[in-house]
Amino acid sequence: MKEDTLYCLLHLWYDIYDIDEQNRNRGDNMRIEICDRASIVNLASTPFEPDTALISIANYGDSFAELRYQPDALLRLVFNDLPISDDAAKAAQLHTMTDAQAEQIAAFYKRVCGKAKILIFQCEYGESRSAAVAAAILEYASQNGKAVFASDVYCPNMSVYHKVLAALREMPG
């Protein structure tokens, strides 16, 4: 791991959670990492560890984090960090997470689960959208999403959390 580059960043919030006991029993120990834009840019300045997957979230109208090196699996999505209902967001054209994007996350997770050893979640500040997606996956996989909510570092976006968790539960596989 690139601790020398990771820990020198001011805005790095880096927590690791093991997914679930069932996966550990199968030997599928997946590490979860939550980080901000600056941290992922720094991390991607050298090759990722093998079997790394990344979900990268950008604000509407912004570019994605620049990755010099890419992980083995990458999902990039654009949606704003607003905790409001779909109807209000659509009416105001605020570009919040859609159900289709939640389904993309669920499909990506189900595709990399059992293959990826590291799953990184990244958004602008590494505390709301990325934390919400990580919490939803942890809740789905191990009923341990509360670990993210209990942290003083994160403030998961509840709309994102509920959409991703619902998509994971509804998607076969």
PLM segments and residue spans:
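Glycine-rich, flexible N-terminal cofactor/catalytic loop recognition
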Residues: M30-L77
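Catalytic cysteine-centered active loop of the rhodanese-like fold, especially the PTP/DSP P-loop
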Residues: R111-A141
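Short, Lys/Arg-enriched N-terminal segments with co-localized hydrophobic residues
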Residues: T5-N29
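Helix-loop module immediately N-terminal to the HCX5R catalytic loop
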Residues: P83-L119
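Cysteine-dependent PTP/DSP-like catalytic domain, specifically the C-terminal lobe
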Residues: A135, Q143-G173
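Recognition helices and adjacent regulatory flanks at domain boundaries
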Residues: E103, A107, C113, E124-E127, ...
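Acidic, aromatic-enriched beta-alpha/helix-loop junctions
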Residues: D72-P83, H95
